Amino acid sequence: MSNEFLLNAESRSDTGKGASRRLRRLQERVPGILYGGEAEPQMISVELRELKKALENEAFYSHILTLKLDGADVQAVLRDMQRHPAKGHPLHVDLLRVDKTHKITMSVPLHFTNEESSIGVKKQGGEIQHNFAEVEVSCLPQHLPEFIEVDMANAELDSVVHLSDLKLPKGVELTQLALGEDHDQPVAAVHQPKVRASSDDDDAAEGEEAASEE
């Protein structure tokens, strides 16, 4: 994990919708909750500007974060976030404490590479279809990957890449595969592009339809 994310957090005692609105409007901070582990859930807030900057990086969503909270460093991951329905800015965050000795389950994005140069596309004229943009993994916090690469270079026409075909970092497991072979779902496939009807065919069809109506 090459990226490092640090958020300055503060404890808060005021709760409720009114308190949250004041926090966002007057202090430009985002309310949240920190839970998990052996400690009790804790109401917190983080700086809006700092959080928005971190959210611009895809890795933030699947990364161990460091919270500076009450003079201590707390390791956590983003579990959930509420956004404004129209403006899109964060309204509330749920953060889960992590312990380096306990596995966590997280969704990690897939990065598809070598698509245009793949055998099925470049040499055989196919198109690549994605079935998933992310997968759920289970691992120790220190093994959590920012993303999983799906190399399509050798994918031929009519071939399918399944979950079991993904190359995973050491110590990382796919939760779906742990459920059995029936859950080995297709991640991507190379197929023939759909043929669109030509304008001549469309004109002919319209002519036949018009003739049938006369």
From Swiss-Prot:
What spans are recorded as compositionally biased (Acidic residues)?
A: 200-214
* Cellular component aspect of the GO annotation: cytosolic large ribosomal subunit
Q: Which GO terms describe its molecular function?
A: 5S rRNA binding; structural constituent of ribosome
Instruction: Tell me which UniProt keywords the record has, alphabetically.
Output: Ribonucleoprotein, Ribosomal protein, RNA-binding, rRNA-binding
Top-level taxon in the UniProt lineage: Bacteria
Among InterPro entries, the record links this protein to: Rbsml_bL25/Gln-tRNA_synth_N, Ribosomal_bL25/Gln-tRNA_synth, Ribosomal_bL25_b-dom, Ribosomal_bL25_C, Ribosomal_bL25_long, Ribosomal_L25_dom, Ribosomal_uL5_bac-type
Q: Where is this region: Disordered?
A: 1-23, 182-214
- Pfam families in alphabetical order: Ribosomal_L25p (PF01386), Ribosomal_TL5_C (PF14693)
Regarding protein family, the annotation reads: Belongs to the bacterial ribosomal protein bL25 family. CTC subfamily.
Question: What does this protein's UniProt record list under function?
Answer: This is one of the proteins that binds to the 5S RNA in the ribosome where it forms part of the central protuberance.
Q: In its UniProt entry, what is this protein called?
A: Large ribosomal subunit protein bL25
Please tell me the species this chain comes from: Alcanivorax borkumensis (strain ATCC 700651 / DSM 11573 / NCIMB 13689 / SK2)
High-level lineage? Bacteria, Pseudomonadati, Pseudomonadota, Gammaproteobacteria, Oceanospirillales
